[in-house]
């Protein structure tokens, strides 16, 4: 049986949980220390609907300093995980402001899975208190669903890398989305 290879790129604001999500899925361990990513690649094998898929996981940096570097990871992407953090309404706001335009520019027609990370913090008293000081509250599931509709995402899912809840679901859904897409013929650039 031949292995199908697909490329997944994860994007979203800095510190919204992208790297933790990838590490928990690919290595089954939660990193306790936050280290901002520049670019990392992981590979994970996943089986969906009887198909063996080798998923190349491309981590990206969310910080603005990397806005010019990040597009280097976009070519030949099969599926995008676009993340925000449930404990950061600002990160959800950046989905239509920053991430959707960037992704749709560099990856037109690539399916987007909108992912609400850090779901476990939605009911965390400290998180609720800290957000209340700024007249904010954790992102509600219906706000995430509405955003997914607004940006025309393939799916909306929530997960917690810390508790592992929903993690596998995110990658199974992403793999299904990647498998559904018929690859267009690669266009060659000609310089005359």
From Swiss-Prot:
Q: What does this protein do?
A: Has a role in regulating actin cytoskeletal organization: required during early development for proper execution of morphogenetic movements of individual cells and groups of cells important for the formation of the embryonic body plan. Plays a role in regulating dorsal closure during embryogenesis. During axis elongation, required for Rho-kinase Rok planar polarity and adherens junction localization as well as for generating a planar polarized distribution of the actin-binding protein Shrm.
Lineage, top-rank taxon, reads Eukaryota
**GO BP, sorted A to Z:** actin cytoskeleton organization; actin filament bundle assembly; actin filament organization; actin-mediated cell contraction; adherens junction maintenance; apical constriction; axon guidance; border follicle cell migration
Locations listed in the record? Cell membrane; Cytoplasm, Cytoskeleton; Apical cell membrane; Lateral cell membrane
Q: Describe, from its UniProt entry, the tissues in which this protein is expressed.
A: Expressed in hemocytes (at protein level).
| Name this polypeptide is given | Ras-like GTP-binding protein Rho1
Matching entries from PROSITE patterns are given as: RHO
The protein's matches in CDD domains, at most eight in alphabetical order, are given as: RhoA_like
- Keywords linked to the UniProt accession: Actin-binding, Cell membrane, Cytoplasm, Cytoskeleton, Developmental protein, GTP-binding, Lipoprotein, Membrane, Methylation, Nucleotide-binding, Prenylation, Sensory transduction, Vision
Give the source species: Drosophila melanogaster (Fruit fly)
Main localization category: membrane
Locate the Cysteine methyl ester modifications and list their residues: 189
| Lipid addition sites, S-geranylgeranyl cysteine | 189
- The entry marks the following residues as binding GTP, namely 12-19, 59-63, 117-120
Single GO MF descriptor: GTPase activity
Please provide one cellular component term from the Gene Ontology annotations of this protein: cytoplasm
Summarizing the annotation, the consequence of altering residue 39 to V is: No effect on binding to wash and no effect on tail hemocyte developmental migration from the tail
Q: How does it assemble?
A: Interacts with capu. Interacts (via REM repeats) with Pkn (via N-terminus). Interacts (via N-terminus) with wash (via N-terminus). May interact with dia/diaphanous (via CBD/FH3 domain).
